[in-house]
């Protein structure tokens, strides 16, 4: 309807190519969008969701802390471990990831990746009062949780707003590489692992997925290799 470019990604792409549907260990649907299409989608979806769906972002859900959007089905319940203590809105969902340019230059690329990780962590600390920490042993878990609480409380006491943090995150993730780019990735996931060539999404191919048709990149072989 709106001619937005999208493609299934990650485990959903693998399942589409190999099984024409879900793979047993993947319990969601992952969709990628070039940044310009993603931003248009966020605007359009606000008007199109109606009462059946909810577009979950940092802007629409004060308790949500992830950098990508979720399109949730209202009147359903599905609670992820990462969100169970956040008070965030639940429901069955599709993950929608923005893809941004990443530098062809190795040194600049590493700077982009480090900046994305840093600001993603800052966003999480600001948004999440009770972190999911429990894998390092009682003593270290206690120290890490205490540091998290101090940083979380400190940012709020200093009058830092969610809008300020979100703006800085967006600037970090969307900053254009200075040394040129023929590639894109999503900084909302394992960015280095999911780098793809722009040419791989120049043509999107319609393929069956369960009982619907979805789009995959023409370069899906290279992406999955």
Report residues per predicted region:
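Conserved catalytic core of two-metal-ion nucleotidyltransferases
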Residues: 1-2, 42-104, 123-223
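Active-site nucleotide-donor binding segment shared across nucleotidyl transfer reactions
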Residues: 2-29, 33-39, 199
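Charge-rich, low-complexity amphipathic helices
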Residues: 20-22, 35, 63, 67, ...
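A short secondary-structure junction signal
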Residues: 106-111
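Short, His- and charge-rich active-site/binding loops that engage polyanionic ligands
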Residues: 113-117
